[in-house]
A protein has these predicted regions:
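Conserved RecA-like ASCE ATPase "motif II neighborhood" in helicase/translocase motors
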Residues: 200-224
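Walker A (P-loop) ATP-phosphate-binding motif of ABC ATPase nucleotide-binding domains
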Residues: 99
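Conserved P-loop
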Residues: 112-194
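Residue-level signature of catalytic and energy-coupling elements of molecular machines
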Residues: 92, 131, 225
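Conserved catalytic network of the ASCE P-loop NTPase/AAA+ motor domain
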Residues: 94, 123-126, 213-217
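Walker A (P-loop) phosphate-binding loop of P-loop NTPases
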Residues: 107
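Hydrophobic anchor at the beta1->P-loop junction of P-loop NTPases
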Residues: 102-104
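Feature 3881 marks metal-assisted phosphotransfer/nuclease machinery
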Residues: 2-84, 90, 122
């Protein structure tokens, strides 16, 4: 947004509160370029991070975001470390948005944030019944050949990122290099962490993308990594 956003739109600006969120209705030529579910922000003395809820010609409605960088809003013990991660968590935790794509370099937290959001909405809010994780099984380098076992066991070599992120989400914050830990990691010591990991694994199914054709998923949180 332009630095003088509030001054520029002050004449026709409407605002109201609903469910701890602040909403703004703005009018002007800028609105024509805004798209629904697009994020807008401005820094400075009056910082603003918002999501475009309605875009109709020269009118738009903005909804302020939940600040997931604050510990009180942590998602399964994970907090946003920058503006982009806060945007991602607002998308992943929004019940009105059914399809989210995240693009970023390796190590920017895409899988971690997605998995934390999935666990919260499956084990805490009960919005979903289980989590399904899949990815394309394309090897880097030489193929390791045919693998024995079930479909899930065959997928194990491609699920290293999942295991790494589950370790972070089930580790107390004081033991984590990032200073962040899982929601239930601090309850019950080692026994509690083991029980939590068992509970998590019971709700996570690993599937191969090669066998997805024709499937219909009801009440599932689907992650394509």
């Amino acid at each position: 947004l332009p630095p003088n956003f509030f001054f520029f739109f002050s004449k026709g600006l409407e605002s109201w509160k609903k469910d701890s969120r602040t909403y703004y209705r703005i009018k002007g030529p800028l609105c024509a370029d805004l798209m629904v579910n697009e994020f807008v922000w401005q820094d400075g003395p009056q910082p603003l991070q918002a999501l475009v809820k309605v875009s109709a010609g020269k009118t738009a409605e903005l909804e302020t975001l939940i600040d997931y960088s604050h510990q009180k809003n942590a998602v399964w013990g994970i907090t946003a470390r920058n503006r982009e991660q806060n945007f991602a968590l607002n998308l992943l935790m929004n019940p009105d948005i059914d399809f989210v794509t995240l693009l970023g370099q390796a190590g920017t937290g895409k899988t971690l944030l997605t998995l934390a959001s999935a666990l919260t909405q499956t084990l805490e809010t009960k919005r979903f019944a289980e989590i399904i994780i899949t990815r394309v099984t394309v090897p880097v380098g030489e193929d390791i050949g045919f693998l024995p076992g079930t479909e899930e066991e065959k997928m194990t070599p491609w699920m290293g990122a999942l295991e790494d992120n589950l370790d972070v989400l089930n580790k107390p914050a004081e033991q984590s290099a990032s200073g962040q830990g899982g929601q239930a990691a601090s309850y019950g010591g080692d026994w509690g962490r083991a029980a939590t990991m068992d509970l998590i694994r019971n709700r996570i199914k690993v599937k191969s993308l090669n066998f997805m054709r024709g499937r219909t998923f009801m009440n599932k949180f689907l992650i394509i990594d």
